């Protein structure tokens, strides 16, 4: 049986169309590629969650939900204690975004997995779901958050809303509704309800509230679905009704086609981007281009005369700290991070971006030979580099992090990240656990790297 074409899902509204699609989409409809992306995304999510479990915000949220108690239904990263589904989603979402090292999607400038995976894992455990249904819900959640985020548009983000938290809540609601086997009416009520719950503002960036936004998105999705299951009635069109969520949270005209075109045929979730370097995502195209130059030419730092980097103009305001002094500042420095890569340092490791690196004389010497200029011809996911060697040779590369990567190469990059964060033994153990595909086994993750 083949799934229906996208036109058949276009009913009265974006929300009702996405609900109809989610209800009709069965596990057998998912391609191997979709399953691979979902599996890699869950693995990457677990990696950054385990690595972030000891961050201060992680301790605070875990301690808070411990103080509240409740049904012992669901696992939380960093403890063997179990919690109610909503609390588990809140904690796991926050923990997974604590390092800001999780995946992103440039279609809506948000982080998809930190909202989707915690909701899926919480209700997967609570309902003792079968693997096929779990992965089906994850795929639908990742697609929903991306399409709603893209439909809300850049204006939503630029107005000050945190798309990870807002669009993420709608994606988490679809996940939760699917795992609870809600019917069409109840799922629409759940989406309507979460329209009153989705929140998060960019003024919180740089504080502990930012990772909490991810936990809120996951928890709101779970709670909205549970309320709908209990019979709570909302306006099912509140996402796009007059005085509804979109009407009050964005000023631009919204094109329904962005949310619905190609639904079920063209999958936006395949364009999810995983972070392979422990720094601002705006640096990643540059670092990948420099890696290509270094590896292709067996380049060593002492043979470099100078480095020229061209980047999209907006990143000069975001990640162009000329002479960083702290590890955090190093994560926002084109020049220092370029020097790290060209010196052969592992930029996937959190420890690489340190105050000691900022004082390293070899890195400083090379950093001072790096220049960065804006190029309006580059997309926001591209960078181009030129390295001049001491014998006058010019080595060039251009890289777009939004390009499609083969599964094998993407897995290798994520695995190298896992090695850097968890160590090889723990990384392989985690991969084997995720590869079982059984969410009822995922609680064993707390035996990996538990502090």
What are these model-predicted stretches?
Residues 35, 39, 43, 116, ...:
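Hydrophobic face of alpha-helices
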Residues 1-109, 206-219, 226-451:
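Terminal-appendage/accessory-domain detector
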Residues 41-48, 118-120, 167-178, 338:
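Hydrophobic mid-domain F-helix/FG-region of cytochrome P450s
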Residues 107-113, 161-166, 279:
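Short helix-coil transition sites and intra-membrane helix breaks within transmembrane domains
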Residues 123, 176, 194, 293, ...:
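Broad structural signal for hydrophobic residues in well-ordered alpha-helices, predominantly aliphatic
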């Amino acid at each position: 049986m083949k799934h229906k074409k996208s036109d058949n899902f276009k009913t009265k509204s974006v929300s009702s169309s996405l609900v109809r699609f989610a209800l009709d989409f069965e596990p057998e409809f998912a391609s191997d590629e979709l399953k691979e992306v979902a599996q890699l995304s869950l693995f990457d999510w677990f990696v950054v969650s385990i690595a972030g479990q000891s961050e201060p915000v992680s301790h605070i949220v875990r301690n808070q939900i411990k103080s509240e108690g409740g049904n012992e239904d669901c696992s939380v990263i960093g403890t063997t204690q179990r919690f109610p589904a909503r609390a588990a989603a809140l904690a796991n979402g926050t923990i997974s975004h604590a390092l800001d090292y999780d995946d992103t999607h440039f279609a809506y400038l948000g982080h998809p997995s930190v909202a989707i995976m915690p909701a899926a894992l919480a209700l997967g455990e609570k309902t003792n779901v079968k693997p096929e249904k779990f992965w089906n819900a994850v795929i639908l959640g990742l697609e929903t958050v991306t399409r709603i985020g893209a439909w809300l548009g850049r204006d939503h983000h630029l107005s000050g809303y945190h798309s990870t938290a807002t669009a993420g809540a709608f994606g988490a609601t679809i996940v939760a509704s699917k795992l609870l086997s809600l019917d069409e009416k109840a799922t629409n009520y759940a989406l309507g309800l979460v329209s009153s719950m989705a929140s998060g503002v960019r003024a919180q960036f740089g504080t502990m509230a930012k990772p909490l936004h991810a936990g809120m998105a996951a928890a709101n999705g779970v709670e909205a679905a549970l309320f709908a299951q209990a019979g709570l009635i909302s306006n099912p069109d509140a996402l796009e009704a007059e005085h509804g969520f979109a009407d009050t949270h964005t000023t631009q005209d919204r094109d329904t086609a962005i949310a619905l075109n190609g639904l079920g045929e063209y999958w936006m979730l395949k364009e999810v981007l995983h972070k392979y370097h422990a720094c601002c995502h705006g640096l990643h195209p540059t670092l990948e281009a420099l890696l290509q130059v270094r590896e292709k030419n067996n380049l060593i730092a002492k043979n470099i005369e100078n480095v020229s980097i061209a980047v999209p103009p907006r990143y000069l305001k975001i990640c162009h700290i000329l002479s960083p002094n702290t590890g955090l500042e190093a994560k926002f420095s084109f020049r220092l991070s370029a020097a790290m890569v060209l010196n052969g340092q592992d930029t996937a490791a959190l420890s690489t971006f340190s105050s000691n690196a900022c004082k390293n004389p070899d890195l400083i010497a090379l950093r001072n030979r790096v220049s960065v200029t804006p190029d309006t011809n580059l997309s926001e996911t591209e960078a181009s580099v030129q390295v001049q060697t001491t014998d006058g040779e010019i080595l060039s590369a251009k890289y777009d992090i939004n390009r499609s990567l083969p599964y094998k190469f993407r897995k290798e990059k994520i695995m190298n990240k896992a090695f850097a964060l968890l160590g090889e033994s723990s990384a392989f153990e985690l991969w084997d656990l995720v590869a079982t595909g059984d969410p009822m086994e995922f609680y064993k993750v707390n035996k990996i790297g538990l502090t």
